Amino acid sequence: MTKVLVLYYSAYGHIEAMANAVAEGAREAGATVDIKRVPELVPDDVAKASYYKLDQAAPIAKIEELADYDAIIVGTGTRFGRMASQMANFLDQAGGLWAKGALNGKVGGAFTSTATQHGGQETTLFTIITNLLHFGMTIVGLNYGFAGQMKLDEVTGGSPYGATTITGGDGSRQPSENELAGARYQGRVIAETAKKLHG
């Protein structure tokens, strides 16, 4: 059975919600799915004072586990148009896997969130995708089979490069049904692609 890892970092819960939707989509395709998060780098007292969502159910990932999966779908909020340092720090530890070619041929994808419509969604996706390409992975985005990314009747995330959500400057906006549908779609397509490639 196809094994999929949804690997994420979420400070305020928006990416956690998107990760759960990505996982739902992958499960719809018949994959076995694990949802894991990367370690927090912000000290606990600072995270609490900043109202970080610290009660997330997903276990902490270990770098050596990445080789166990057929597909890895990576999500993180943006930090100035790039992936959050927590995710970058985790992926930077994959040098040993890279040196062995342990991730070559695996399927990868990316999803993100920004505070505003033009807050760096696509550049953040590119920073994730660039890492995955260097690992030797085959990238699957959010193709136009998902018609929701063409919507003009509401503010919505979504890009051919990956599922996205818009949080609002104060973080009060939660992922919309359309954005969650995009995440589910991407998860399903990635799992289907991994099944075709890896059986």
UniProtKB/Swiss-Prot annotation:
The keyword NADP applies. Its cofactor is FMN. Pfam families: FMN_red. InterPro entries: Flavodoxin/NO_synth, Flavoprotein-like_sf, Flavoprotein_WrbA-like, FMN_Rdtase-like_dom, NQO. It catalyses: a quinone + NADH + H(+) = a quinol + NAD(+); a quinone + NADPH + H(+) = a quinol + NADP(+). NAD(+) binds at residue 12. One of its GO terms (molecular function) is NADH:ubiquinone reductase (non-electrogenic) activity. It comes from the Bacteria. Substrate binds at residue 98. Its EC number is 1.6.5.2. FMN binds at residues 10-15, 78-80, 113-119, 134. Coiled coil: none annotated. One of its GO terms (cellular component) is membrane. Residues 4-190 form the Flavodoxin-like domain. The keyword Translocase does not apply. Keywords: Flavoprotein, FMN, NAD, NADP, Nucleotide-binding, Oxidoreductase. Binds 1 FMN per monomer. It is an enzyme of class 1 (oxidoreductase). Belongs to the WrbA family. This is NAD(P)H dehydrogenase (quinone). It comes from Bradyrhizobium sp. (strain ORS 278). The lineage of its organism: Bacteria, Pseudomonadati, Pseudomonadota, Alphaproteobacteria, Hyphomicrobiales.
